[in-house]
Regions:
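Conserved NTP-donor binding/palm subdomain of two-metal-ion nucleotidyltransferases/polymerases, i.e.
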Residues: 1-217
Length: 217
């Protein structure tokens, strides 16, 4: 990215931090044209399906989804059921589903940050840590946490599911927001493959099945 684009994104992320987290940061002066560009990026980010706490989100990969269902069922019947931990898992799955089908959801990442700031202290991270291992999603949770650290001013200590920071997480988000790829393709996010191999396999399995189902005999 050139310096102009970097300034636009710096101010975009600063304005989002102020709006959603109350973090005031000094923004660089920008021309009206640059602010229009920032507004266009913001509008694109807001076009995604928003996270809803009333919805249940699912994995693209069937194996991961079966494991998620088992985890949720076992937790709901546990003596020490942690609703906050289940809710965190739901937000994480929403973000993973969106990343695997379309691309990074900035509103989804913001929702994750808001949840951690408001209810993170009530989450049982011993349980959550075991779930991330069972579901093979630690690279994905690290990507989400890295975006929060690099764009929203979070400290790594606020995000226990950050197992290894992704150095170029901010750049990946910026590239996605600037891309023009179409919904439902992995063309704009092939670099995400290393974060979710199971998800990519599940995505293409579903796409092939849909194509076969649509073939007229």
């Amino acid at each position: 990215m050139n310096r102009t684009t970097e300034i636009i994104f710096d101010n975009l992320f600063s304005s989002l931090c102020a709006e959603y987290y109350g973090d005031k940061a000094e923004m660089a002066p920008m021309s009206a044209w640059k602010w229009r560009q920032a507004d266009m990026l913001r509008k694109k980010a807001d076009t995604v399906e928003p996270y809803s706490s009333a919805a249940v989100y699912h994995f693209v990969n069937a194996l991961q989804e079966r494991r998620r269902e088992r985890i949720v069922n076992d937790e709901r019947h546990a003596i020490d059921t942690s609703v906050e931990t289940l809710n965190l898992l739901n937000i994480i799955v929403y973000n993973i589903n969106h990343i695997e089908r379309i691309g990074i959801s900035l509103p989804g990442i913001i929702s994750l940050g808001k949840y951690m700031r408001s209810l993170g202290d009530k989450v049982d991270f011993v349980k959550f840590d075991s779930w991330t291992k069972t579901l093979h999603i630690r690279r994905m949770t690290s990507l989400m946490a890295s975006i929060l650290v690099q764009t929203m001013g979070f400290e790594p200590s606020e995000l226990p599911f950050l197992y290894a920071e992704v150095p170029n997480a901010r750049e990946m988000l910026c590239r996605y927001l600037m891309s023009d790829a179409q919904d439902g393709t992995w063309n704009r996010s092939l670099s995400l493959y290393r974060f979710s191999k199971l998800g990519m396999i599940g995505f293409w399995h579903r796409k092939i099945k849909e194509m076969l189902d649509n073939i007229e005999e």
